[in-house]
Amino acid sequence: MALWGGRFSSGPAGDVFALSQSIDFDWRLAPYDLRSSLAHLNVLENAKLIEKSDAGAIRKVLKEMQVELAEGTLLPSDQDEDVHSALERVMTQKLGPLGGALRAGRSRNDQVATDLRLFAIDHMLQLAEFVIALQGAMLKKANEYKDAPAPGFTHLQHAQPVLFGHELAKHAHSLDRDLSRI
């Protein structure tokens, strides 16, 4: 789907189009774009800016696209400039002109910002799960080695002996602060 228009009689030269394409790296935003599109559809429907029957048809296609994306059968084409144009192209193929109805009331910049926020939240939650798993593993080992002596360090030099279990528990506990900042 061409994003170019207005006073131009044709699209950009091939090299310019290739330079402006971001589909190679922003396709990972597709699940978030579909989620934000469903939310935007709800807003349009609740504000009565889109007919209930049209909203139902769009919602059905968006959910089908989520399934296809998860299955790996929904893919961008070489002609898609970015994730948004790719998904709108598929919507328009499936729904005709109704597929472009989701453009109402939202800018491309807002769409990008929302998708990136959802992406970041999702990945931060995954990171938090990894940190919690690491803490659990460290505390399990801390209990296992609660009586094992180990060399303590201060200012990068050997200091008094400590219990290895205490060292592990100390580091596991210090990750609590990191978790609170995620």
Task: Give names to the regions the model predicted.
Residues 1-182:
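A helix-coil-helix interface module used to build multimeric assemblies
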